[in-house]
Amino acid sequence: MRILSALLCLLLGVACSPAPSSDTLTRWSMRQEGSSRSYPVQVPVTVAGALYEAGYFGDDILEGLRFKEADKSIFDTPWIFTTRFAAREGMHHVLRFESLGYSADITLNGNLLASADTTAGVFCVREFDVSQFAGKDNTLEVRVHRAPDASLNHGWVDCNPRPLDETMGILGPVRLISTPDVQVQDVFVKPVVNPKDFSSARIEMVIKLVNRSQTPVTGIVKGEAEGISFELPVRLEASETRVLNHTETVEHPRIWWSAEMGSPQLYHLKVSFGDSHCKSVRFGIRDIRSELTADGHRQFILNGKPVLVKGAGWTDDIFMRDTPQSISRQVQMVRDMGLNCIRFENVWGKDDTVYDLCDSLGILTLMGFSCQWEWDHYCGLPQTPSHGCIEGEPWESLAVRYFHDQLIRLRNHPSLIGWLSASDRDPNERLEAAYLEVYNQLEYRPYICSANAVTSRISGPSGMKMAGPYEYVGPGYWYEDTRSGGAFGFNTETNPGMNIPQKESVLRMLGGEQAWPMGPAWDYHCTASATNMNSVKPEVAAAEGTYGPLRGFEDFVQKAHALDYDSTRAMYEAFRVNIGRATGIVNWMLNSAWPSLYWQLYDWYGVPTAGYYGVKHALEPVQLVYNYATREIVAVNDAAPQAAFHAQLLFYGADSRPVLCRQKDFVSRAREPVVLGKLPRNTPGFLSLVLRDENGEVVARNFYCIPAVNAQHDWANADWWGIPILSYASLSFVDNLPRADVKIETAPAEGGALVTLTNTSGVVSFQNILKAVQADGTLVPGPVWEDNFISLLPGETRTVLCRAQDVSISCDAWKP
């Protein structure tokens, strides 16, 4: 908890000392129009989220089939949010709404500030000067309307069912900004640094001032940050808005790096106008660019160094109930896995918490609009063949307004490395020209026309690809495929299908009566796609085809874990092995909006999947990996400094007897994979890889269950969703092993416990799953285990840290 508290404190920034203030209005009441029943709520919030918190739907609305059966008619009528506040005398007052879902009638003390027909649009930021209406005691009322079927609303697409209320509510902070005469409305910092010489940097500032009074005002704009201070005399005419451009030089700047490349150094800048309003922003000094490789793939370059982007896709909670604490835990899990990027397809977040944390922790972010606006069955607007649904007015103007407002909102975040103006398609030429006019005025980062492999007549090729798969593929696919989603280029979204949660979470989301035999809730908690990825059948076939007949619920879950671990790990490892030809990989998804069986590295309850730990092993800074295509052992290193290492290779046969032992010293350099050996062909078994540094300390491990022959994919019939499998890799020898005897011991440690597993038997013990169980029987969420899903050779001992207290620790073995 101390880590979370420290991170949240970082978000507070530097407080402004002058009397003017910016108060966030968080305490509201909410009621359905025509009803006298009122609910106390904390804004930002959706109507459905507030009702969920109030117990309106019951505790289990998201479990089983209950969400499918829920009554949505209560959202047909408007809902009214009301708050009261005091406004200080002698000040000008501005109300700022950062997101409304989807439109609203806004009144202050009975005075209409805006009507629903002028406030449609979830990503518009709106300010209202309310000085003439605000007094000592004020009543603010916001009457929100649900998004119509045809709209540019939040993009939930097919990862989960649509929210019951279509994300209806006050979705961003509402702020009361009180200032004497002049408001410092916006401050933007563009850092300019030569990546070949970090001795100094230019700080190009754009400062927007608004004179809220009806008379001219003269004063001094003051700015302060580490290493710089300045004063600028300014005269503003009555009601004038002025944009100032000012540049300062910082000597010997602290440079912002992603976590794997260095330290994410941050600065704070405070800008004030006399004794009037002040504004603080946080920024980082770094250089970000992108280029197309000789093969036409998008390559991002941070501070002069090419980056292999290793990311996953973010979504908000279906009720938008994320808190600073839950977001902090999730970003910590991203860091724990070794991922260096989060892709936001949709401008997620009720506020900037997730982006602030990415800045602090050195996690890159890719921002862009949702493919929901590119398919008529999601957007509700007519679909054009090439460009989706944003066609003509008022939709193009609304999209440009979205782009403008969100660029301004997010452009000070150093973690943000680029904008994707579309996802599955690209904007039409008229719309993209309007986007670029705004972008070139406000931004400097790489602009990319699409997350898909398209070429714009205006901005050129995207350099990206989006060719799947989204269903299960064998781990060898990532090495063997050279046409679709394999390890080449920049794959903006892909995933080997079901990432099944641990059994405790599965039972929570399905209900015991649905678990076995499999009931319809299994398919309902896959994805909401109408075409594929909506059934558990592919995973059942893969589990049986790979490991053998299913013995029941727990046996299926464990075999599905093993499939997830191997293929998700191999996806990242293959891109590392092919670094240079491979420039980026984004797992679809990082998390889930609701209790799901698909597309996640940790589940809705915050508990890691098997794939989580597969990714954690895949992304050790320097690691030994198995190339499924060539059977080679490869040392990979994306960004770590040059160093000497010692590699140990142990290969045991399918009968758990030693076959091969190899030792090798080598030097690892960034972006230079090293082949260290090769396994014999057509020989199944267990592979243990251990990497030690010059001092003999273990710095990385990897363990594989190797088939004699990889899964055989039907390359001729590959499709956008995936590829048929002609025959599965046979790992049935794992299931035929006698059950191993594993002794578990615990010892207290700071903040948790040390857990030691010892395999006392003469056979391999495959994927032991450690559990930290709370008093209510649920698993502790978050990055609790240093490692998990642990396999042990005969006689092997492993000790791992459990970062949880007051829990029951247990271990699930293979063959439950």
Residue ranges: model-predicted function:
Residues F81-T83, C124-F128, E240-E248, E672-V675, ...:
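Short strand-edge motifs at loop-to-beta-strand transitions and within beta-strands
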Residues Q132-D137, V206-L292:
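Extended acidic/polar, glycine-enriched regions
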Residues W28, A54, E63, F67-E69, ...:
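An acidic-aromatic loop/edge-strand motif
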Residues A19-R96, T118, L152-I170, P180, ...:
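Extended carbohydrate-recognition surfaces in non-catalytic/accessory domains of CAZymes
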Residues W28-G34, D76-Q183, R212-S213, I228, ...:
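Accessory beta-strand-rich segments of carbohydrate-active enzymes
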Residues C341-M533, L563, S567, Y572-A574, ...:
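Substrate-binding/catalytic cleft of secreted carbohydrate-active enzymes
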Residues I207, R212-Q214, G519-D787, L792-C802, ...:
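Carbohydrate-binding surfaces of carbohydrate-active enzymes
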Residues D60-R84, M91-F97, Y102-T107, A114-D117, ...:
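Active-site-adjacent substrate/metal-binding segments within catalytic domains
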